[in-house]
C-alpha cells in the first residue's frame, strides 16, 4: 500500500518520529492517522522504557513567569548529554512542564517523593470519611485506595493529566520526548511561586 506523503508529513509533525517509522505506522494502520499516532506513542513508550535506567547528569534550569508576573516556576530538567540539553526540542519540553506546574500546582515530582506520613494521613482521612458514611470496613478500604489514587493524580506532577491533552499524563509526554530525542529525560525538582501564597 502506497503511503500518502502528506499523511507521513502530518504524522511526523504530530509525533516527531522519523519518516520511515511514520510510513511503517501508517501502513500498519491502513492509513488511519489517529491509530498511527497511538501506535507510535506505544512504540515511543517502549523506547523510553529501554532508556529509563541511563544516568541523567546534564540538563537545564528552566524559568517561567506567567503573564502578569503573579506566578513563577523554576524547573530542573535533566538529560544524558549537553547536546540534548541545548536542543530546542528539549527546551520546548521544559517550557511545557513549567506551564503545567504553573497551572496545576503539583506538590511533588512523583509519588515516591511524598513523605510516608502524608500518604498515611490521606488514607486515614479517606477511610474514616467512608466509615462515617456507614460503609463496611472492607468497602471503606477500597474507597480509601481510590481516593489515594486521585490524590496522587492531583499532587504528583508525573501523574497529572497534561493540560494541553488530558488523554496523556506528564509522564507520557516525557516518554514521547525521550523517543524523539533518544535520551533518558528526568524531572529532578521544581519550585512554584505565587504572589500571596
Curated annotation (Swiss-Prot):
Gene3D superfamilies for the chain: 1.10.286.20, DNA helicase RuvA subunit, C-terminal domain, Elongation factor Ts, dimerisation domain
Pfam annotation, one family: EF_TS
Compartments (UniProt record): Cytoplasm
Record carries keyword Magnesium: no
PROSITE patterns attached to this UniProt entry: EF_TS_1, EF_TS_2
GO CC aspect terms: cytoplasm
InterPro entries (UniProt xref): EF-Ts_dimer_sf, Transl_elong_EFTs/EF1B, Transl_elong_EFTs/EF1B_dimer, Transl_elong_Ts_CS, UBA-like_sf
Keyword terms: Cytoplasm, Elongation factor, Protein biosynthesis
Major location (coarse): cytoplasm
Domain of life of the native organism: Bacteria
HAMAP family per UniProt: EF_Ts
Membership in a protein family: Belongs to the EF-Ts family.
Function, as annotated: Associates with the EF-Tu.GDP complex and induces the exchange of GDP to GTP. It remains bound to the aminoacyl-tRNA.EF-Tu.GTP complex up to the GTP hydrolysis stage on the ribosome.
Record protein name field: Elongation factor Ts
